[in-house]
Regions:
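Conserved GNAT acetyl-CoA-binding A-motif
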Residues: 117-128
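Conserved catalytic-core motifs of GNAT/GCN5-like acyltransferases
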Residues: 124, 142-155
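Conserved acyl-donor/pantetheine-binding loop and adjacent beta-alpha core of acyl/acetyltransferases
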Residues: 68-102
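Conserved GNAT-fold acetyl-CoA-binding loop/helix
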Residues: 22-42
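Conserved beta-strand in the GNAT
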Residues: 55, 62-73
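A short beta-loop-alpha structural element at the N-terminal edge
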Residues: 2-16
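Conserved active-site alpha-helix within GNAT-family acetyltransferase domains
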Residues: 128-146
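Conserved acetyl-CoA-binding loop-helix of GNAT-fold acetyltransferases
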Residues: 99-116, 133-138
Length: 155
């Protein structure tokens, strides 16, 4: 698997992956995360333009997953409740990690790529996203506390 920047021509497949991810979340008990068409095509276009959107591709170049990776402070991480960050060092943030569900190891490939770029990585997920929580725990992430994202929901 390889990671590369998302190109605008990838947008239809990336949006299909997010459609699949929303349906998967609903089917696994996560009914309140990524609602109302989130993430929107406009948001992903902006992330492509900003150089923050990436895709994970298979041996034939097929897109298997997508995510956002941003180096630098995330405004939603400035306040943490019922806990504390592990350190105050500069960090990278992973957002909107999703796969098409057709191949194992895609999430891990994306996480590996992020850690190769920056050793201090933060990620948040919804309390009902048990699948992502399992992946993050397996990968060695530790729960640090609660943050609130832009729409006011807890992570």
């Amino acid at each position: 698997m390889e990671i590369r920047p998302t190109e605008i021509k990838d947008l239809p497949l990336v949006m299909e992956i997010y459609d699949y991810a929303r349906a998967f979340m609903r089917a696994t008990g996560n009914t309140t995360q990524w609602i109302d068409g989130y993430p929107s095509e406009a948001l992903i276009c902006q992330e492509i333009e900003d150089g923050h959107s990436f895709v994970c591709t298979g041996e034939q170049g097929e897109i298997l997953g997508t995510f956002c990776f941003i180096l630098g402070e995330d405004p939603t991480y400035q306040q943490i409740y019922k806990g504390a960050w592990l350190n105050d060092e500069p960090y990278g943030v992973i957002h909107r990690l999703a796969t098409n569900g057709k191949q194992k190891g895609v999430s891990e490939a994306c996480l590996d790529w992020c850690f190769q770029r920056w050793p201090n990585v933060r990620v948040d997920t919804h309390r009902d996203n048990k699948v992502m929580q399992h992946i993050l725990t397996k990968y060695g992430f530790q729960r640090c506390g609660i943050i609130y994202v832009k729409n006011g929901t807890e992570r």
